[in-house]
Amino acid sequence: VQKQKKLYEDYFEELKKVKSAIANYKRVKDIIEMQVTMVNEYKGAWALFRQDKNFTAEELEYMLNIYTGMMDESIKNIDQLFMVVNAFATQMADAKRLEIINGVTDNVQQQLLDMKEFNSQNKMLSLQRASEKGEIEYVKRLYWLSR
């Protein structure tokens, strides 16, 4: 009876681990999808801003520095995720794992919002400058604002 009880205890303990892993996997998948979106936002916006004649070389350098900082923070988030995923091979309490995943999720969501806001502000600045120069249609076409 004791042997059977121990067997079932071990079995249920493993089931709890699997359940936790599956729940964490969904969050990790969401984080990775947001990271991919952020990289795509950066690549698309940066390609457009480099073509935009309404920005000076100094402004483009400033933008690149901002993007570099955002990407560096993104890498830190990925490092934290790897730590959590690798923690399945070692011991880490589920509460600690969940705490790290939640923190990374919050960071990535905020970084994605910040990047979208930064891109939007730069597009608006270009539109403002274009309207002052009478080049509004050029900028609208560049940023797909009119079809």
Locations of regions flagged by a protein language model:
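N-terminal Sec/ER secretory leader and immediately downstream segment
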Residues: 1-35
